[in-house]
């Protein structure tokens, strides 16, 4: 991204286009180029020298305050008149000093806009202080009816003032607010609070905007207040909130993005009001869910603004005699025209409005900061942001130079040739043609990015429009639609028509707004077309209709799919490829947003980046527990969906899928632990001495999309409060993981593998756990619990406890064991598992039937428990396939048979995974499908345990 650099016009001083005095020691730049500065200097002796001194360094708030004090005292008038004169004289000095620093190359764009913003805030505060003192003497102080506290006028700066981007000859957009209704107290002529603040507001506007012999301070625009010019000048927070709920319009959301309190935020009253104001404005501006409806709304607003800009430009051209400038055919209004400043602002704001409800990091005001944040999140390319940044700075600098000439609030390029050359030289170009050429390049780049972001991608005539728009209750037209469906490849056209008819005449469809209904109609037609391209069109369209039923009440989702046809194509593929994926997307339609990021759909996960991003979102949510729970669920669902999409595209096999799902679960557990600890009111230390150990699928890193988590909780803390604190911690953790919120749930959790199962303590001191596993004492672990240890691992929490657990696990596994008793125990446990998962069908259960996955897992566990004392490498939690290979290489079992069984396990897992994706709860296949693989598994079992038929459960 191009760094900001000051722009100097020094090479072009003393040009014929600038008939001012020759440059000298005093204001050589502004006096050469600004007619307004020339007039000020000619009117007041010594004025230019004072401004020259002020321009020696950046304009600071301290300097503003000191200089205002001097001018106020020198005015020698009544306070309000002295205020007006001092602010106007100060404003002229600030304008000229900034022009000098800017044109000389001493000031950056940020310095100029920052200084103008500082001055505007200072002027508003100074005016309130002076006028408020006079009003207080007459009417007393406004007091809140409920709180009994003195009230203050809260001034909200909107637009560029709110974003600290004020230009040098700008008006300022203000909104006047106050906290409570009530009356003034302590004065001879009391008023209601509303009357008092209205009077204060009017006099504040006059103090800033009245044109006197000294000029003006700022033009003040109050039209952004509730109900615009028809609304009260000052309104209470309660009225503002009611207005947002009842009448708030879409464009007002954009305006309030940059709304910022500019009156003194330091007082306790102001701090409280700011907090209350955020509570009112945040849900209005930033919707809780992804809001893609703003794209069409901004597109419409932009068209209206551009048309108005063109009308103004045409009027300006007529006023200037229709100068035949080469730029007039392009876009003379650099703010509102094609490729102008407003288009850059809209590109930035659309990301805020769509995602700001969920991403606190996008709730910022300056345009360039928003673009940088969007690039960091992958919402827009870094190259595009660099181009927009360069264009924005160029356009803002050009805007300032247009305004320096006559202190006019203009954004139009000049028509007079002498002014065209003047502006070109102020921008550092030798002539006007060179300026226009560069301007056109920037405008083209901005317009191209704007069109890419906001272009209307809707089909003019969707291919299946005749089907959905037909009167589906009319027999003749229904027959035509039926024939078209058959032609498109639908097998059971009557069933499809029945579903379409039910959807079209449902109360849900009828309740849609006109705009949402139009989008729904468009999407149904696209869905019919996309489904027809799949191998099973009937199934796909049925899933589409279920999906549309789920999302139809959320106009944002309809907007997203309408605006991004490529997302619709990916939805079709997802719905067709997997019943489980279709159900998952239907339950979590916010995941539609993930379909827009093509790069993310093919990238490997960055778990460190994931942790940092989620941690930042959780931190930004503060103490909002439900919001934090939703953030964890949103992030987990999004990452799961990315894995799922890569899976459906054939990019991953089952092993890396399980690895990624397990890594994701680890990360979510870690983040949840961090967050929940802060919610434990009885916590006794900054960092808990607490660890989560995973067993089962998560422990073996064989997690599936819908697997539950087998967890136990260990702590190593001798504080007398520790057992109670960590028990509460564990219970709260489970609640956070398993609760259903608006965003869904995270995991089902099973803690029955803890010592003594469901009858045992929820959390276990590490030393007690060690004694239990090592069988020191009467309360000792069973063989099946040592079997479970073969694929247990530390997954979250205190890494020191995790390391001690791993050392203990290895020690337990390496204990010497007698083959006979161990074989009997494990064979008996296998029989009990088989009895608990009876298969009444002729199908082969890939997991539980003899010759299936459980036989392989129990065989591996037996080999690990029997031989780890001699072969330490068997204690590695490396997965069943790797452990089978090790056992074969060590000669513990036949190596060739081990390889065949490993292949069978891999095949079983892949088949199980596919069946789960197809929505089947039991992983069963026709018996002959896997007969060869199952025979190898049974052969290995018989080699290790003896005949399957001979095995029987122990009493």
Curated annotation (Swiss-Prot):
A biological process from GO: regulation of glutamine family amino acid metabolic process
Molecular-function GO terms, alphabetical: [glutamate-ammonia-ligase] adenylyltransferase activity; [glutamine synthetase]-adenylyl-L-tyrosine phosphorylase activity; ATP binding; magnesium ion binding
EC number(s) given by UniProt: 2.7.7.89, 2.7.7.42
GO cellular component: cytosol
CDD domains, per the entry: NT_GlnE_GlnD_like
Sequence segments annotated as region (Adenylyl removase): 1-458
Names of required cofactors: Mg(2+)
Catalyzed chemical reaction(s): [glutamine synthetase]-O(4)-(5'-adenylyl)-L-tyrosine + phosphate = [glutamine synthetase]-L-tyrosine + ADP; [glutamine synthetase]-L-tyrosine + ATP = [glutamine synthetase]-O(4)-(5'-adenylyl)-L-tyrosine + diphosphate
Origin: domain of life: Bacteria
Broadest EC class assigned to this enzyme: transferase
InterPro entries: GlnE, GlnE_rpt_dom, NT_sf, PII_UdlTrfase/GS_AdlTrfase
The entry's keywords: ATP-binding, Magnesium, Multifunctional enzyme, Nucleotide-binding, Nucleotidyltransferase, Transferase
Segments of this protein annotated with the region Adenylyl transferase: 464-955
Protein's job: Involved in the regulation of glutamine synthetase GlnA, a key enzyme in the process to assimilate ammonia. When cellular nitrogen levels are high, the C-terminal adenylyl transferase (AT) inactivates GlnA by covalent transfer of an adenylyl group from ATP to specific tyrosine residue of GlnA, thus reducing its activity. Conversely, when nitrogen levels are low, the N-terminal adenylyl removase (AR) activates GlnA by removing the adenylyl group by phosphorolysis, increasing its activity.
Family: Belongs to the GlnE family.
HAMAP family documented for this protein: GlnE
Protein name (Swiss-Prot/TrEMBL): Bifunctional glutamine synthetase adenylyltransferase/adenylyl-removing enzyme
Taxon lineage: Bacteria, Pseudomonadati, Pseudomonadota, Betaproteobacteria, Burkholderiales
Gene behind this protein: glnE
